[in-house]
Amino acid sequence: MLGILAKLFGTKSGRDIKKLQPLVERINEEFQKLHALDDNQLRAQTDKIKGIIDADLSGIDKQIKEHHDKIAANPDLSIDEKEVVFQAIDKLELERNKELEKVLEKVLPQAFAVVKDTARRWKENGKLTVTATPMDIELASRKKNVQIIGSTAEWSSKWLAAGTEVTWEMQHFDVQLIGGMVLHHGKISEMGTGEGKTLVATLPAYLNALARRGVHVVTVNDYLAKRDSEWMAPLFEFHGISVDCIDKYQPNSEERRKAYRADITYGTNNEFGFDYLRDNMATDKDDLVQRGHHYAMVDEVDSVLIDDARTPLIISGPVPKGDQHEFAELKPRIQRVLEEQKKLINTYLVEAKRYIAAGKEKEAGLELLRAHRGYPGYKPLIKQLSETGIKSILQKTENEYMAENNKRMPEVDLPLYFVIDEKHNQVDFTEKGVDFITGEQEDPTLFVLPDIGSELAKIEKDKSISDQERMEQTEKLLSDYSIKQERIHTLQQLLKAYTLFEKDTDYVIMDGKVKIVDEQTGRIMDGRRYSDGLHQALEAKENVRVEEATQTYATITLQNYFRMYHKLSGMTGTAETEEAEFQQIYNLDVVVVPTNRSIARLDEQDKVYKTTREKYNAVADEIVELTEKGRPVLVGTTSVDISELLSRMLKMRNIKHQVLNAKLHAKEADVVAEAGKPGTVTIATNMAGRGTDIKLTAEAKASGGLAIIGTERHESRRVDRQLRGRAGRQGDPGSSQFFVSLEDNLMRLFGSDRIAKFMDRMGYKEGEVIQHSMISNSIERAQKKVEENNFGQRKRLLEYDNVMNSQRVVIYKRRKNALYGERLKLDILNMIFDLCEDMVFGAYTTKNYDNFKLRSISVFGVIPDITEEVFNKATAETLVKSFYEEVLAHYEQKIKFVKEKTQPTFNELQLTRGETIENIVIPFTDGKRNINIIAPLKELAQSDSRALEQAIERYITLAVIDMHWKDHLREMDELKQSVQNAAYEQKDPLLVYKFEGFELFKKFVYTVNADIVSFLFKADIPKQDTVPVRELKQQPVQQPKYRETKDEAGSAFGGGNANQQVEEAVAPPKAEPLRSQKIANRNDKVSVQYMDGSVKRDIKYKAVEDDLLSNKCVLIEE
């Protein structure tokens, strides 16, 4: 039915492309006109187009400038007058963006034609020759492709990109012009792999760069960001448009700041997001790196906005006692319970076999279900389930016990120590497990949380104890609860680390560290860490040093980060399957752009085997057959472990091959360069998926092109399509074939029920293969189930973050106002007014004058002139106005007093050392806390300057916001965890979170306002004989000791997504143990490192043998 409608009315994408066709013709007309121009005249077109843009926007730009000038010239405007002006500026900025899009649409044909003709000239002529400009001369000093010959500059068509020399041989096709327009219009362009998406991006990047508001080109990894920026840069630089890449430079560096000032900035999604968070932790506007969020173009948009959207960006820092933990102490208990559970599972498997042999399917089913609940990934269990009929027995039993909302499942779990739910990535202790890990001589409640509510009520009602005893008992109860909560959490994370995370699949051990492998890209997420104690648990599990715990300082989801842009667009080869999500979350349309040449790749139906052993043998046989034909082969695997297994199998068969995985990423460029040669076998994880362009030699094309072999279906159809897309690029020949077994994760969890029954019914024996469209469709349905599950998680994550986002917008706007200063005075006046209003109305209804007076003294340090008589008779509005004017007058007098007190010192410093001192540090205190104020000496010395007042207000506002914001984030994190229990009360946790979160935020805003205002009113220079100011000496730039993190939101399977954070350390690297591989004799001298980082050197092995066996330390080589 849908096919008939599509034939009658056409597809949405088809209709979109039809609308763009007239524009393609106009671009090509302009392109033909440019042929008659010389290279200098072609270059002059850029300034001509800029002139058109400036002329169309000159009127609105003039109005904006007039409003800013009004604020600068009239610092004493009232609150209401300032508010009106700032609202007018904001409105004009929005209007300017609309007008800008109109003028860009007007000049689009000329702009696209300029880029296309520049590409043509390089391709056909090999060089461009123009009159040298200052930018040409500067570029020639650092780039070999630009040479200055006399007064001319010669731009060669050869240059370096990612260390490899490239020769420009590309020119934009019509379909690429269409792709460029789709991107410019703020939509997603789906273009087949090999269709030149990197080249397509040059068209809208050039056009939008002419607006001089910044263009951000976002990629999935730093290799692509650096490569693409260097590859495409000359196309822009020839026209005077600057290009840079943020991933080439350190965070917070001057070089990165300059990269953002470039007209076009390339970088990875994570770094763009983290720079935004870092900017919102800066204390000086000169420390900011980003300049706004105007236009973002996201390469591999589905990977960035969908796959990575499950991972909120988080900056975290140290917490008090963060190095104190019980991982090493509790680890042996987890190891013991794991061993006991495995013994139990083995018993169940033996019993199941016995029952099956006796024809007792019901009893066998219960034993199998217990084994499956206790350890679903246990290899002997998986092996047994692959036998004919066994899987269906398990499923039948599971359905029976899951009936009526898992009513009978407790019967199954009763004898187990813990239960694993693979589909939801959860593991929980049973009562038997808790009893087991509690020693016989220990308190039975060691791992049991007390009922805090009822216990507190008991203490409160106990009339036999004094108030002092009541307070002591309450403190002891709360302390006991906190300790037990942390201990239980540590145990839970250790259990997760041992049962849900697999070495060489979810993480690898390199350089004495646990390094996470990104399941989507197969790359090491270098320096990133899981948070919430999970990474520490993995470190304890793998016997490497356990790092310190952290707390959140700043956070944002990628969804909310990218939604800040005025215009957002993206490109990928695989977006259509997620079209609904793009529309719903980002309001982005997907347009499928036709290929330039038809795809010649042959995509075979999946080959399905019963066991992984059969599957890998079949893969090896297929590789042998393909290499004998002289075809290059790319073997895609889902983990480092599988890539190494296949490598060993091929070595045994004497097949020469190369491996690309997270451990061997340094060889990536060399491996990719070789992968297109005849007979070359490349085994790769998902690293060889997105963005990898394998160039085929003529011999390879003649032998049938690149053969893709997938060793397992990924949970996402898009990752499979990306792997297939490495072959058949630009009309090249090629083929793809996936090999699947019923033991694969995807099949085991979601897809193998019907296939297993079908294979059993048809009598398939071990080693036989099934290949049918029905099977491929069944696998695709399984993938859809996972994708739907993941979409639900992402949407839920976004709904939670929307609560935080509305709060973040308010706070970051206030921080920005404080940094830039222009709107800060208005914010402070509003704070003072709100506090005056709150104090008056809070006491007015009850006529409690004493309360009003006490709060005034407490916050403002002011005894109000308003008498009790006036307070009781006047209206509340009159009292607010009168009180506000009085308080404001006191504040102005306070600032004047501080200035008079410090002015002589400033004048003397300027007179004696003004030539050498630029900024000075002035200490301020409110009697409790000290804050250093930094201000320029030259401005402070001017008697009519407001520099001191502005510096005091800025630094105090920033310090107070930052101090309370991190505490508020912790409270919101704790709230998010606690509201999940609302589900047991038949309440929606999200609604509870929204309500409670709003109440927390109101409390937070009041606290911040009161703290800022109180500090401003009470702040003074510490009492000394002289004003204690000092010169601000330039310190070398140091990396801040915090981590950037990504909070994994969980896929349907795979430990690497188990609802945890992933952290990126930016603190200085610490010495790590180089773990020794040798086995020592008992009297040998050895060196060991303990879990706390301490080292014992040249000590006899037998002296530390017990510690080594109990995993308290590791052998190291020095």
From Swiss-Prot:
It is a peripheral membrane protein. The keyword Transport applies. Coiled coil: none annotated. It comes from the Bacteria. SUPFAM superfamilies: Helical scaffold and wing domains of SecA (SSF81886), P-loop containing nucleoside triphosphate hydrolases (SSF52540), Pre-protein crosslinking domain of SecA (SSF81767). SMART domains: SecA_DEAD, SecA_PP_bind. Residues 1034-1056 are annotated as: Disordered. CDD domains: DEXDc_SecA (cd17928), SF2_C_secA (cd18803). The keyword Hydrolase does not apply. ATP binds at Q176, G194, E195, G196, K197, T198, D693. Keywords: ATP-binding, Cell inner membrane, Cell membrane, Cytoplasm, Membrane, Nucleotide-binding, Protein transport, Translocase, Translocation, Transport. It is an enzyme of class 7 (translocase). Signal peptide: none annotated. One of its GO terms (molecular function) is ATP binding. Part of the Sec protein translocase complex. Interacts with the SecYEG preprotein conducting channel. Has a central role in coupling the hydrolysis of ATP to the transfer of proteins into and across the cell membrane, serving as an ATP-driven molecular motor driving the stepwise translocation of polypeptide chains across the membrane. Belongs to the SecA family. Monomer and homodimer. Part of the essential Sec protein translocation apparatus which comprises SecA, SecYEG and auxiliary proteins SecDF. Other proteins may also be involved. NCBIfam families: PRK12901.1, secA. This is Protein translocase subunit SecA. It comes from Cytophaga hutchinsonii (strain ATCC 33406 / DSM 1761 / CIP 103989 / NBRC 15051 / NCIMB 9469 / D465). The lineage of its organism: Bacteria, Pseudomonadati, Bacteroidota, Cytophagia, Cytophagales.
